[in-house]
């Protein structure tokens, strides 16, 4: 391909040669509506289940947190799991999830390039944070004593992966997407990923608060027992 020819793909850097690229046959709105509709249905189902299945009553904030972890389970296990298995054929594949990743890659082409960091990060996310997110939901519904430990572990892991995701692209000079584009850069790359900093950040502090309170109660109980023995 000569330098004066326009690339036959929508990805950055524009000089990329992607011989296997097959354009999506689904429009952008179809892909986004499909993704957010399924996520919305999952949120509604989790919200209803959290009031009917939980062994103890849960407050509004806790039920919303469970909705978040239910969506995380779907995204980590299904969407990111799909990428982990099929990243090498995304460019030519026309399955819905492959087209979703080709659409998202307009904001970060590292995904259709099978970038080493991205593949490893997404594989870890799918294998660890996906199942553990589901475990968080179950742990809170069953009122298991380690529920806040799970919440803390998953949330810290999500933040860590997201920070590395942003910093590696910053180090590369934001060359894998059109910098400043309202949809591809600001929505796909910035907003959709910043969510995994904000919400897990809140949940980290929430878990720390509950674990600290539990430890304080245990310490006070131990001190009372010791004082009685003295």
Swiss-Prot record:
Q: From which source organism is this entry?
A: Rattus norvegicus (Rat)
- What protein family does this chain belong to? Belongs to the EBP family.
Ranges for domain EXPERA come to: 61-204
Q: What catalytic activity does the UniProt entry give for this protein?
A: lathosterol = 5alpha-cholest-8-en-3beta-ol; zymosterol = 5alpha-cholesta-7,24-dien-3beta-ol; 5,6alpha-epoxy-5alpha-cholestan-3beta-ol + H2O = 5alpha-cholestane-3beta,5,6beta-triol; 5,6beta-epoxy-5beta-cholestan-3beta-ol + H2O = 5alpha-cholestane-3beta,5,6beta-triol
One GO biological process from the UniProt record? cholesterol biosynthetic process
Additional notes on this entry: Binds to the phenylalkylamine calcium-ion antagonist emopamil, an anti-ischemic drug.
The regulatory note on its activity is: Enzymatic activity is induced by 25-hydroxycholesterol, cholestyramine and lovastatin.
Gene Ontology, cellular component aspect: cytoplasmic vesicle; endoplasmic reticulum; endoplasmic reticulum membrane; nuclear envelope; nuclear membrane
Q: In which tissues is it expressed?
A: Expressed in liver.
Task: Note the Pfam families from the entry.
Answer: EBP (PF05241)
Report the transmembrane regions from the record: 29-49, 66-86, 121-141, 185-205
Ubl conjugation as a keyword of this entry, yes or no, is no
Which Gene Ontology terms cover its molecular function?
C-8 sterol isomerase activity; cholestenol delta-isomerase activity; cholesterol-5,6-oxide hydrolase activity; identical protein binding; steroid Delta-isomerase activity
This protein's name: 3-beta-hydroxysteroid-Delta(8),Delta(7)-isomerase
Q: Which pathway does UniProt place it in?
A: Steroid biosynthesis; cholesterol biosynthesis
**Is Cytoplasm one of the keywords UniProt gives this record?**
no
Q: How does it sit in the membrane?
A: Multi-pass membrane protein
Q: What job does this protein perform?
A: Isomerase that catalyzes the conversion of Delta(8)-sterols to their corresponding Delta(7)-isomers. Component of the microsomal antiestrogen binding site (AEBS), a multiproteic complex at the ER membrane that consists of an association between EBP and 7-dehydrocholesterol reductase/DHCR7. This complex is responsible for cholesterol-5,6-epoxide hydrolase (ChEH) activity, which consists in the hydration of cholesterol-5,6-epoxides (5,6-EC) into cholestane-3beta,5alpha,6beta-triol (CT). The precise role of each component of this complex has not been described yet.
The chain residues annotated with the modification N-acetylthreonine are 2
Q: Where in the cell does this protein reside? A: Endoplasmic reticulum membrane; Nucleus envelope; Cytoplasmic vesicle
Q: Which residues form a coiled coil?
A: none
Enzyme Commission number? 5.3.3.5, 3.3.2.11
Q: Which domain of life is it from?
A: Eukaryota
Record keywords: Acetylation, Cholesterol biosynthesis, Cholesterol metabolism, Cytoplasmic vesicle, Endoplasmic reticulum, Hydrolase, Isomerase, Lipid biosynthesis, Lipid metabolism, Membrane, Nucleus, Steroid biosynthesis, Steroid metabolism, Sterol biosynthesis, Sterol metabolism, Transmembrane, Transmembrane helix
Q: What PROSITE patterns does the database record attribute to this sequence?
A: EXPERA
